[in-house]
Design a protein with these regions (language model features):
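Short hydrophobic beta-strand element within catalytic cores of glycosyltransferases
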Residues: 136-139, 146-150
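Alpha-helix capping/helix-boundary segments
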Residues: 12-14, 92-93, 153-154
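Donor nucleotide-sugar binding/catalytic pocket of nucleotide-sugar-dependent glycosyltransferases
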Residues: 1-40
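Acidic donor-binding loop of glycosyltransferase active sites
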Residues: 4, 118-132, 143-146
Length: 205
């Protein structure tokens, strides 16, 4: 109660402050990025390769990726054995390097995040907890990426499910999403272009 007001970057965060008992005025300030520095590279022949990029010293990322690799990836790999998953981020825990998950590549820290994102097809955001705005999702949208995310991962974002992002909370949801992309690989680009359009309309500084 030592402040005159609270600025939150999402409605969820504003509600969380209220749950903590704050009666102060709240202002939601949407997050934005300069799209001029995000140039999508559209692959004319997209493939079923997946990626995650995020700080690996953040507990929700570790929790979500362990869940994804333990519960979701084995089924994806069984149904789509030619697919690959590339996991990148700074401060990668040693446990991830020790994993023996098939077709999972632990990249670690990358020099150029935009180049890494542009070199892959489908962003995976398997968050189960955590607040704030998922900056990496907005960056992925800005670079024209198809994105599969849990509902928690997409909290605070404006989106239309299955148009500019695909929400998946359990293994069947992920399989349905990947089936959609696999039926026509151009659907990867279709959703990515829709995501870019959303970034331009809602998240451009």
């Amino acid at each position: 109660n030592q402040v005159d007001g609270i600025a939150a970057i999402s409605r969820r965060d504003a509600i969380d402050f209220e749950k903590l008992g704050s009666k102060k005025p709240k202002l939601i300030i949407p997050f934005g990025i300069n799209l001029d520095v995000y140039t999508p590279v559209i692959n004319e022949n997209p493939q079923l390769n997946f990626f995650h990029l995020g700080s690996m010293d953040w507990t929700p990322n570790i929790e979500g990726l362990n869940w994804f690799l333990d519960e979701i990836w084995p089924e994806i790999n069984r149904k789509f054995p030619k697919s690959h998953f590339y996991l990148a981020g700074r401060d990668m825990p040693e446990d991830f390097y020790k994993r023996k998950s098939p077709n999972v590549h632990i990249v670690g820290e990358v020099e150029d995040a935009k180049n890494f994102i542009n070199s892959n097809s489908i962003m995976i955001v398997p968050l189960l907890s955590g607040g704030g705005i998922r900056v990496k999702i907005i960056e992925g949208m800005a670079l024209g990426k198809a994105i599969i995310s849990t509902a928690v991962g997409a909290e605070g974002l404006h989106y239309k499910n299955k148009k500019n992002i695909w929400i998946a909370n359990k293994v069947d949801d992920f399989i349905k999403a990947i089936n959609y992309f696999n039926e026509d690989l151009q659907n990867i680009n279709k959703m990515g272009l829709s995501a870019r359009a959303l970034a331009e309309s809602d998240y451009n500084e």
